[in-house]
């Protein structure tokens, strides 16, 4: 079995935050808040939370807070539910939720919920299961789940439930690993997991493991290291992690590491990025790989954080 290149990954994480003299850094303004979450989670999972620059990160996140109560990806951009949940998750990790008006953020989120229970990503109206999950995740962290119309939210989530046991991004859409995570985790947070067939769901997820040990997002697709989180977390939520080959998946994930520069890629020998680094490490955490911080499969937050917040 390959080894986890811990020191390489720590150096990689420090390096990606200091590339301000590179054009690529500025071309990815739309990913800055997301990248902060992925980086902070990676530091936590590697048991190096003390190396997170808390003051710098909190200051930047506050510069992304808009008058509406939501967060933008970068100062001057529009707010969006995805940036809002990532910002709130980071503030929770850094024990800094007190710097925002929780009621105002919660009101912003509820303003995105539609009458049918779904949730818009922003004022422009795009609807997606990921957005509803993000709102539920965020409200739970803020202690404001009572703001949510839970009945309509659950009804809409169940409309995304498919005959094969999986979930799509909207009613009638094909089952997909990432949507399975968002819907299953949302139902778990809302204590409504009894509405689904866990045996059928476990079958659908276990079918995502392919030759070589990796997981894909849907049938006939290539494996990708990020599905070590998206597929595995709902399997953890329903208590069926033993339905996949643990050792083969670990070998696949470790095989996507860059032995020279650190970081994880989607597949072996591809370019690394902080997104795949975060979710590969989160997957290894669910697999109880040695010396990695335990993760909460509902929130993709360190278990220490969610336990402290009594989530």
Swiss-Prot record:
What is the catalytic activity of this protein?
geranylgeranyl diphosphate + L-cysteinyl-[protein] = S-geranylgeranyl-L-cysteinyl-[protein] + diphosphate
Keyword Membrane attached: no
Which coenzymes or cofactors are required? Zn(2+)
GO CC field: cytosol; nucleus; Rab-protein geranylgeranyltransferase complex
What Pfam families does the annotation carry?
Prenyltrans
* Annotated binding of geranylgeranyl diphosphate, by residue: 176-178, 218-230
Give the binding site residues for Zn(2+): 224, 226, 276
Summarize the protein's role. Answer: Catalyzes the transfer of a geranyl-geranyl moiety from geranyl-geranyl pyrophosphate to proteins having the C-terminal -XCC or -XCXC, where both cysteines may become modified.
Q: Whom does it interact with, and what assembly results?
A: Heterodimer of an alpha and a beta subunit.
What family does the database annotate? Belongs to the protein prenyltransferase subunit beta family.
Can you name this protein? Geranylgeranyl transferase type-2 subunit beta
Q: Which organism is it from?
A: Schizosaccharomyces pombe (strain 972 / ATCC 24843) (Fission yeast)
The gene coding this protein: ptb1
């Amino acid at each position: 079995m390959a080894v986890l290149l811990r020191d390489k990954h720590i150096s990689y994480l420090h390096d990606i935050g200091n590339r301000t003299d590179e054009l690529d850094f500025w071309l990815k303004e739309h990913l800055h808040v997301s990248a902060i979450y992925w980086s902070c989670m990676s530091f936590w999972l590697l048991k190096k939370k003390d190396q997170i620059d808390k003051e710098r990160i909190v200051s930047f996140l506050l510069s992304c807070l808009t008058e509406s109560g939501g967060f933008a990806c970068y100062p001057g951009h529009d707010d969006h539910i995805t940036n809002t949940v990532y910002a709130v998750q980071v503030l929770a990790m850094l024990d800094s939720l007190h710097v925002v008006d929780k009621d105002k953020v919660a009101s912003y989120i509820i303003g995105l919920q539609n009458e049918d229970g779904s949730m818009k990503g922003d004022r422009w109206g795009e609807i997606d299961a990921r957005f509803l999950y993000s709102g539920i995740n965020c409200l739970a962290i803020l202690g404001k789940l009572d703001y949510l119309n839970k009945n309509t939210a659950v009804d809409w989530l169940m409309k995304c439930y498919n005959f094969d046991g999986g979930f799509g991004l909207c009613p009638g859409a094909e089952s997909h690993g990432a949507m399975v995570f968002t819907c299953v985790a949302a139902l778990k947070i809302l204590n409504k997991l009894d509405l689904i067939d866990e045996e059928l769901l476990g079958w659908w997820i276990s079918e995502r493991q392919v030759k070589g040990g990796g997981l894909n997002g849907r049938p006939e697709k290539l494996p990708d290291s990020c599905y070590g989180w998206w597929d595995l977390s709902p399997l953890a939520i329903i208590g069926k992690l033993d339905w996949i080959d643990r050792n083969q998946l670990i070998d696949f994930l470790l095989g996507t590491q860059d032995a020279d520069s650190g970081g994880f890629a989607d597949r072996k020998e591809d370019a690394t990025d902080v997104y795949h680094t975060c979710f590969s490490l989160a997957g290894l955490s669910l697999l109880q790989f040695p010396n990695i911080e335990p993760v909460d499969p509902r929130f993709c937050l360190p278990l220490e954080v969610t336990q402290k917040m009594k989530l």
